[in-house]
C-alpha cells in the first residue's frame, strides 16, 4: 500500500495555483495556526502501520508530503504572490525542526527533506521585521535573502544572493494609501525580467497582472464577500490554462471548502475541505476520483501532534509533531 502514497503526491503536484490577498496579519504562530506560546516544533514522518485499533510508526520517510523539487517550485511561485490553500498547508509538512522567539517569530529552521540537512537562520530588526534569511548547508552559506524597508516601514527592496548565481533584486512600489501597486524582478545590472501590477477596489486586490519583458503572461481576478473574505479567484496563465477557484466559509468566517476547476472542466480539478484552523481534512481529485483524508490528534493546547493520512480509505502516513512551549 505504500506505493499509493507516491501516487497521491503525483496527483497533488499538478500545476494549479491561486492568489489570495494576504493572510491575517500576525507572527509565525498565526501563520502556522499554532495556539499558545510555542517554543519549538519538530516534525517527523513515517509510514503508518496498523496496530489493533491504533497506528504505530513504521519506517521513516525522508521527504515531506511534497518532494523537494515541488516545494522549491511552489516557494518561487509564492514569492510572486501565488497561493493555493491546500498546497499551502501540505507544503509545510516536512521532516523539520523549527525554533521560535517569545514574540512568535521563527529564529531557526532545520529542514531534513533534502539530500543534506539545511539550517535557515532568520534575523529581525527591533520592529520584528525580517531583514535577513540565510540558508546554510554543512555550515556553508548557500543563500542569503536581504530585505530593506523605507522610512514608512514598507518593504522597498529585496536582494536574493544565491552565491552560485547572480543576485536577483526585487523592488516594490506603493500608492499613497500604502498599497503595493508594482513589483519588479531583475538580475544585477539587467533590465527588469518580470513586472507585477496590482489593482485594488475598496482596499481589496481585484486584479493582478504579471509581465515578462512587457508581455502579459499571467492574470488574476478576485472577488470578496461582505466580510472581506475571498470567495472567487480566476487565475489564467496566458495561452496555457485557466484555474477557477471558489471558496466557502463557516459561520465564524473560517475557510471551510475550496472548489477548483481547471479549464472549466468538472473532470479536472479538486475539492478540499478544512478544519476551523485551516488544517486540511479532505482532498478529492476529480480526474481519478482519488480521495486523500487527514485525521488528527491534538495536545492540550489544541495543536495537532499526530496526523494519519488516508488514501482511498487506507492509512499511509503517520506524521508526528513534538511541540515545546515557553
Spans of features found by a protein language model:
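Buried hydrophobic residues that stabilize the cores of well-folded domains
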Residues: 21-326
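Bacterial Sec-dependent N-terminal signal peptides
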Residues: 1-25
Amino acid at each position: 500500500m505504500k506505493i499509493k502514497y507516491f501516487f497521491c503526491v503525483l496527483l497533488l503536484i499538478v500545476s494549479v495555483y491561486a492568489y489570495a490577498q494576504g493572510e491575517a496579519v500576525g507572527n509565525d504562530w498565526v501563520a502556522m495556526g499554532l495556539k499558545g506560546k510555542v517554543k519549538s516544533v519538530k516534525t517527523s514522518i513515517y509510514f503508518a502501520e496498523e496496530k489493533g485499533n491504533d497506528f504505530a510508526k513504521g519506517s521513516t520517510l525522508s521527504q515531506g508530503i511534497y518532494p523537494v523539487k515541488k516545494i522549491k517550485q511552489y516557494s518561487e511561485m509564492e514569492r510572486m504572490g501565488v497561493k493555493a490553500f491546500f498546497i499551502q498547508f501540505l507544503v509545510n509538512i516536512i521532516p523539520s525542526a523549527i525554533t521560535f522567539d517569545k514574540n512568535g517569530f521563527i529564529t531557526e529552521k532545520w529542514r531534513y527533506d533534502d539530500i543534506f540537512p539545511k539550517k535557515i537562520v532568520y534575523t529581525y530588526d527591533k520592529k520584528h521585521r525580517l531583514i535577513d534569511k540565510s540558508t546554510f548547508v554543512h555550515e556553508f552559506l548557500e543563500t542569503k535573502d536581504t530585505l530593506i524597508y523605507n522610512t514608512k516601514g514598507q518593504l522597498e527592496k529585496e536582494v536574493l544572493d544565491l552565491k552560485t548565481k547572480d543576485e536577483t533584486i526585487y523592488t516594490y512600489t506603493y500608492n499613497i494609501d500604502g498599497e503595493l501597486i508594482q513589483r519588479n524582478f531583475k538580475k544585477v545590472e539587467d533590465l527588469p525580467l518580470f513586472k507585477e501590477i496590482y489593482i485594488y477596489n475598496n482596499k481589496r486586490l481585484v486584479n493582478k497582472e504579471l509581465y515578462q519583458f512587457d508581455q502579459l503572461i499571467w492574470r488574476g481576478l478576485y472577488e470578496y464577500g461582505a466580510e472581506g473574505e475571498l470567495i472567487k479567484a480566476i487565475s489564467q496563465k496566458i495561452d496555457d490554462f485557466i484555474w477557477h477557484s471558489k471558496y466557502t466559509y463557516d459561520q465564524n468566517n473560517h475557510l471551510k471548502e475550496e472548489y477548483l476547476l481547471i479549464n472549466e472542466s468538472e473532470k479536472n480539478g479538486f475539492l478540499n475541505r478544512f478544519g476551523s484552523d485551516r488544517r486540511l481534512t479532505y482532498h478529492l481529485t476529480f480526474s481519478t476520483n482519488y480521495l486523500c483524508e487527514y485525521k488528527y490528534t491534538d495536545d492540550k493546547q489544541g495543536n495537532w501532534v499526530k496526523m494519519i493520512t488516508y488514501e482511498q480509505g487506507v492509512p499511509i502516513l503517520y506524521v508526528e509533531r513534538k511541540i515545546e512551549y515557553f
